[in-house]
Amino acid sequence: GATVADAAARPLHWIYDQKTLQKHIKGKKDFAFLKDNKSPFYSIKTGKVSGYNDVGQVMFHSLKEDQNEKDILSVFKKNIVKNFGPGSLYWKNLTLRKKYKKIKWRTKIKGPWIHQNIMETIQNIKKKKSITGGIKVNESDGYCAALPYFLYGYNFNSLKKIISIVTVSKISLKYALAKFHLIDLALKGAKDP
């Protein structure tokens, strides 16, 4: 469900100005899976997912590869570098993005957008740091990464380790854990989680 929702909303990704957003959806009964990308930063084919969902997909594939709870941390780190690091389309677009930052931003990057937390994570993994998560931004990457792990039924207490692979921002950690507590309550049948 989360993957479909991400893909459906992705053409409107990162449009923060409400007037601009209203302009893009005006007169539309349904604005899921918009044909034309409206994201101001990057453009990918409609139906493709954002980097937030992609990091969750990387965890999902890591779990398929190795379900041993002790090994999943190293498998996940390896797969983050493989999916987002040097040689990937994400990394190629990061190089283009750095070029655009030096001059006036004129156009969207064609292809996926790598997030700050993922860039920091890759750098920290390559430096063999024990703490790999990004610290510069408060985003949902850690939550998205840990969602498949949580849904597989792993220990609730070990979620922080998974989230921290991608972010160690205190705000990101708190929000992610709060979301997991709400999901946990809902899964257990709480009337009003």
Question: Regions from the language model: what does each represent?
Answer:
Residues 1-193:
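Structured, active/binding-site neighborhoods that engage oxygen-rich ligands
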